[in-house]
Each structure stands twice: as C-alpha cells, then as structure tokens.
Regions:
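Single conserved hydrophobic/aromatic residue that forms the stacking wall/gate
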Residues: 200-211
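A short, structured active-site edge motif that brings together acidic residues
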Residues: 71-81, 119-122, 156
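Short acidic low-complexity segments
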Residues: 4-5, 112-123
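Asp-based phosphoryl-transfer active-site loop
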Residues: 9-27
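Substrate-recognition element of Asp-dependent hydrolases with the DxDx(T/V) motif
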Residues: 15, 35-61, 75, 94-101, ...
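Short, charged N-terminal beta->alpha structural module
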Residues: 88-111
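Conserved acidic, metal-coordinating active-site core of Asp-based
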Residues: 120-199
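Substrate-recognition/cap helix-loop segment adjacent to the acidic, metal-dependent catalytic center
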Residues: 39, 55-74, 111, 147, ...
Length: 211
C-alpha cells in the first residue's frame, strides 16, 4: 500500500539497491509503481549503494533491464564517496593497492588516481566489496598494513544480499584483516554521514531514506 500523503509531503526519496529494490535479477513487487508515483507527484528519487563492485553505468543498465527508469545522475555509490574523500584529503599523490573489482579500479583511474597492481608499488590500501577477491590480495593487504600505510574501506557492511543468500561484504573482510594485523580502516560509506552529505550538496531538502 502506497502512503500517498507521505509521497506528497516528501520531495526527495533515497533508495538503497541490493535487497531493497531488487534481489539478484528480481525486482520486488510494487517498485515500478512506487517510483512512477513519486515522479508523477513532482518528487525525485536517487539511488544510494555501498556496493562498490559495479560502476554507475552497470547499475543504470541493470535497472533499465528490470524496467526502472534510471540515469547516471540518479546514483551515488560508495566509490563516488571514496573519490570525494580522497580528493578532499589530498589523496591524489598516493599509489593505491585496491582490494576491489576491476570496475572499482577503473573508476579510480578515471578519476585520476594511481592504482598499483603490485604491492611493492603501493603506499596506501583501499578495500571494497571485492567479488574477485583472492588469497594473494589478502596476503598483500596484510603485508601493506604491517608497513603502517593509510587504509580506507568503501563500506562497513558485513554481508551483501544475493538471490541465493548472503555473501561476505567489505566489512567482513576488513574484520578478518583486523584479526591478522590489528589495523582498522577509515570507513567511507553508509551509515557514515559523507554519502548523505554529498546528496545534500545538490539537493537542499529533507529526504526520505529507504533501505
């Protein structure tokens, strides 16, 4: 049941993706109708996700395939927030070893950051939701953390929901590294305030966040 009074009062709606609008390739019932109702009543919606494994372009393609109207400007990911944080804190001169997907690496390179493929060339470590994770990456991360280099993570989530259940997310891997190295990262994504603050920069209103 859609609460039309709530839709009328609110003008900006922020939606999480995995496990909120869809699970795997299955869109939840009522999602299309809800989003259409928001737009029809003069509201706007944006999509926020901690999932760093995909690019915005991949998310646009997925939602379009599921029948949801979406453009690249409708999205904010934890990689977007990470890039903003690195720029604000003088991170352009560092060389980053990335425990993340090739998509995450490509986004960082496109933003002007140096991604080191070898740990010997790195002087900072970035952790994401790495669906391409290998034991070699974990070993490299432990060695780098032992050297005391800066350490950041896209998000604190323990698990990511999938069509077949839950899988370990970035937070679980960071916990494993903490057990091995006693190092904890600076965490960027939700529920940290940075991502929402980036939305407020361009949307000066009180949104309704649905996760």
């Amino acid at each position: 049941m859609v609460d039309h009074n709530l839709l009328q009062r609110k003008k900006l709606f922020l939606f999480d993706l995995d496990g909120t609008l869809y699970l795997g390739d299955r869109l939840f019932p009522g999602v299309r109708e809800l989003l259409s109702c928001i737009r029809a009543r003069g509201g706007q919606y944006r999509f926020l996700t901690n999932n760093s494994s995909r690019s915005v372009e991949a998310y646009v393609q997925k939602l379009t395939r599921l029948g949801v109207a979406a453009e690249s400007g409708d999205f904010l990911t934890s990689v977007d927030a990470l890039i903003h944080y690195l720029r604000e804190h003088g991170g352009e001169d560092r060389r980053y070893y990335v425990c993340g997907t090739e998509s995450m690496k490509s986004q960082l390179r496109a933003a002007g950051f140096t991604v080191a493929e070898r740990r010997e060339d790195a002087n900072a470590l970035l952790m994401g939701f790495d669906t391409e994770l290998t034991f070699q990456k974990l070993e490299d991360a432990c060695i780098l953390l032992g050297q005391g280099i800066p350490y950041l993570a896209t998000n604190p989530d323990w698990v990511c929901p999938t069509a077949y259940g839950f899988v370990p997310d970035c937070g679980s891997v960071c916990e494993m590294l903490w057990r091995a190295t006693s190092r904890r990262p600076i965490v960027i994504g939700k529920p940290k305030p940075l991502m929402l603050s980036l939305i407020h920069i361009s949307e000066p209103t009180r949104p309704l966040y649905i996760s």
